[in-house]
Amino acid sequence: MNQNILSRSACNALRGLAIIGIFLHNYCHWLGPIVKENEYQFFQHNADWLLQVMANPDINLPIHLLSFFGHYGVPVFLFLSAYGLVMKYEAKPHLSADQQAQMYNISGRKQSWSISWREPLRFIRYHYLKLFKMMIVGFIAFTMIDYITPGARHYEVLGIVSMLGMFNNVLPNPDNIIWPGPYWFFGLMLQLYIVYRLLLYRRHWGWTAGLMLLCIGIQLLLGFDNPESEAMNRYRYNFMGGMLPFGLGILYARYGEKILMTFHSPVTNIFGCVFCISLIYSLSLNMIGWTFVPFFICLLCVLVADLLQEVSWLSGIYKVLEWIGVISAALFVTHPITRKIFIPISRHGDIYAGLLLYIIASIGIAWLFTQLMKKIPNPKS
């Protein structure tokens, strides 16, 4: 087990960076003339549109870039969630030294362990309730705001029940069921918690690597057939589409720089960041490369974490990102509320005024909701 690769403050700073990308993306991609992303499916015309915008930049270039790339905050969250699971549940010293060596040495063999089915169910129940506690406050507030503002959603019983039960991702046409859209993440996380506990928890590294390769392979097959298909859409709405960054988080927590290398030199890390950003941009322009972008997103976030901690003049940015990371859960569940209110300003022509009001209101409300969520008792493990 690799110890203290990412500190708690570094994880919070990366959560802050990730949620900034997510909540700005979820505003910008709603604007008609702005480049659209390839999040669940790969549309070549979206990649070509980005190239056209980069060749002829205008005042809206930052909006285009946030719309196209901002959703990659989700893989960062998956990476950090997996990292946190391993550090919480696998770093505890309840195995002998020999057992630890066999379990975590990359070349070692896994021992077989007999466990009661009750413990995995308790684990899944605990994490479902944690997600529910986070989601329900924002969902209640959003549905009320949605009802009293123009363009209210017509909810159906199945949509509501599946949202609260977090199984909406597996239903047909998830785009038409999940509302607000960002809440698809809760169903995804619940699936990954189940996969982790039943298949990957304290298992040989080959289980994680094998599942990653299997999910990537199936996605490539779907992409070669039709990357714009509904089959690809449904596939990436579920745990298979997030297995690459989630698996990397597990392996990085266990083996550290054997998986994702940092250089412990600010100058070298800066070059590493530039290299990753260049690769992310170029790989995003074709279907095969797009499949592997989350790997370089995870590598970039590790390099950024190392850089922020190494360079003293970045300490102010580091502290701001760390604070945003602390309120990231509340910001995630509440930003659809402020988006619904302020998006008309940007749609009617004043893009940056609407965006600025949205940012200010979202962060303020997220801080308030963070205080509110502290009042809700945590589930018992």
Q: Which residues make up each language-model segment?
A:
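Membrane-cytosol interface segments of multi-pass membrane proteins
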Residues: 1-216, 347-381
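Histidine-centered divalent metal-coordination motifs
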Residues: 25-26, 332-335
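Alpha-helical transmembrane segments and terminal signal-anchor/GPI-anchor hydrophobic tails
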Residues: 219-330, 337-358
